[in-house]
């Protein structure tokens, strides 16, 4: 009985195998299986992402460079003369008035004591109104300032404002003018002044000695 059962089972198994084989052949599965087995799958390596490089920051040691201004070596000690007493300032005006009286040239002249606005900041020099009306005319123009060395400096005269504008700063800086210095302006030509400087606190010394 046992042998008979095994034989029937074997026949049934073989029959199923044959049926499955025929189905695979009908679907062309054997050939597909061979292709899959024979083909090697190539796996591409992962590409590295390019990360933008951050530029390196370098610390730079910047040294301060002191640039010396032109004419610093020729400056007088102006800081000590910014706030001179009225007594000292009046003494400089008195000496300038005396110098004016001794000119004896017959040319029109006037005395002008320097204020802060004349020698720093805006560098504007107002002239006596009556002197301007009498001797300088009603129109703007160029007025030349001649120092005691004979050097000439052109300035712009503004008739409506009765004063010197452009060019006056150059004269003031070139002669190291400071608060309290007193100037005598002598009109030697219609558009030219000879300028004499009395330094405040100079104790009678000439402007040449104090420059």
UniProtKB/Swiss-Prot annotation:
It holds the Pfam family B3. SMART domains: B3. GO terms for cellular component: nucleus. InterPro entries: B3_DNA-bd (IPR003340), DNA-bd_pseudobarrel_sf (IPR015300), REM16-like (IPR044837). Residues 110-201 bind DNA. Keywords: DNA-binding, Nucleus, Transcription, Transcription regulation. CDD domains: B3_DNA. One of its GO terms (molecular function) is DNA binding. It is found in: Nucleus. This is B3 domain-containing protein At5g42700. The lineage of its organism: Eukaryota, Viridiplantae, Streptophyta, Embryophyta, Tracheophyta.
């Amino acid at each position: 009985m046992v042998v008979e059962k095994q034989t029937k089972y074997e026949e049934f198994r073989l029959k199923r195998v044959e049926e499955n084989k025929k189905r695979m052949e009908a679907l062309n599965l054997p050939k597909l299986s061979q292709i899959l087995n024979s083909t090697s799958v190539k796996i591409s390596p992962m590409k590295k992402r390019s990360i933008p490089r951050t530029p390196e920051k370098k610390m730079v040691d910047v040294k301060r460079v002191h640039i010396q201004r032109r004419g610093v070596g020729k400056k007088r000690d102006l800081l000590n003369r910014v706030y001179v007493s009225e007594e000292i300032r009046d003494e400089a005006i008195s000496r300038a008035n005396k110098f004016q009286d001794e000119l004896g040239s017959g040319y029109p002249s006037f005395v002008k004591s320097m204020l802060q606005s004349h020698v720093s900041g805006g560098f504007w020099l107002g002239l006596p109104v009556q002197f301007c009306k009498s001797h300088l005319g009603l129109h703007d123009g160029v007025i030349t300032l001649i120092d005691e060395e004979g050097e000439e400096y052109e300035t712009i005269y503004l008739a409506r404002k009765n004063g010197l504008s452009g060019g006056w700063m150059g004269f003031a800086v070139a002669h190291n003018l400071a608060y309290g210095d007193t100037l005598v302006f002598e009109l030697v030509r219609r558009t030219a002044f000879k300028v004499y400087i009395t330094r405040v606190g100079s104790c009678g010394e000439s402007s040449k000695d104090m420059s």
